[in-house]
Amino acid sequence: MLRRLSCLVILLSSMVMLPAAQSRGSAPAFDSAKAYEHLRQMVLIGPRPAGSAALHSTRAYITKQMAAAGLTVQEMPFTVQTPIGSVNMVNLVVRLPGRRTDRILITGHYDTKLFRDFTFVGASDGASSAAMLMELARVLKGQPHEFTYEFVWFDGEEAFCRDWDECKNPDGPDNTYGSRYYVSAARKANALSSIKAMILLDMVGARNLKLRKDGEFAAAWLNDIVWATAKKMNHGSTFIDLPGDVGGDDHEPFSKAGIPTIDLIDLHDYPEWHTKDDDLNHVAAGSLQIVGDVLIASLPEIEKRLMTQR
């Protein structure tokens, strides 16, 4: 345990001691075909609940694909007590150094919810966010940026009990295990202050994608930048100007720690959520393209805002 904690402190400390990014040539564009293929490959693995062999295979796939893009994945292992017992989990981290060591986290979860009575492959809820992070990391690797970008694939976002709050207890909810662990570990390593913003992608693959503004835990200025960017890019029909509060997602622990967050999630308009129909028939590469393009275009504005804050 002491050795694991020592390694974790080194990992988190290294996140705030990074060399400046080098200028690069022409950067690649976001390719939704690549992102969709990552999504498809993860769906083919099957259900991927935390602690399963299938999720281990998913980690191996992500690590291999990131290595092919010239990026190194670092593992953040931890063990938690859940309603089904002790479960070993692993967050995955890829860092793209910027001119500053202060970080913008770009995150999502890569596990799927445990269902015992039907096959749940989580095409949008799990695979879409994990696939988006892989393609975004590949693309942003080739673009100079002021802040360090840190991509985090969270384990254990999904609840083990059938209903989301069925097994909630005073010590914590039955969900968001990976993000809560990350925040706790960063706090212990005195690394929280270097996180200037946290962007969460969750359920962004639906064919008829509708993203609403979370007003419960998201920072209004982050919502404003992303939605204004989407409008300029003629994607107002996807980034709709309606409220859609989202609690119990991976941005919540960061928001409670005082970090500005945003959650891009199609929760209120995706009837396939947590059903057997969250499959390849209900997701589309075009939705991934819209989110990827808007997010990449929003990042310079987010950085500009952060540089003017005192």
Where are these regions (language model features)?
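Bacterial N-terminal signal peptides
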Residues: 6-17
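Second-shell loop/turn segments in exported
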Residues: 24-29, 43-56, 80-83, 116-127, ...
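A non-catalytic alpha/beta surface segment that caps or lines the substrate-entry region
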Residues: 26, 37-99
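Stable alpha-helical elements in mature extracytoplasmic
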Residues: 31-41, 54, 58, 62-65, ...
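Sec/Tat-exported extracytoplasmic proteins
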Residues: 39, 43-50, 66-73, 96, ...
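Active-site-proximal beta-strand/loop segments in catalytic clefts of secreted hydrolases
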Residues: 42, 76-78, 96-98, 107-111, ...
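Active-site-adjacent substrate-binding region
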Residues: 79, 197, 204-310
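Acidic/histidine-rich catalytic neighborhood of metal-dependent amide-processing enzymes
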Residues: 117-225, 246
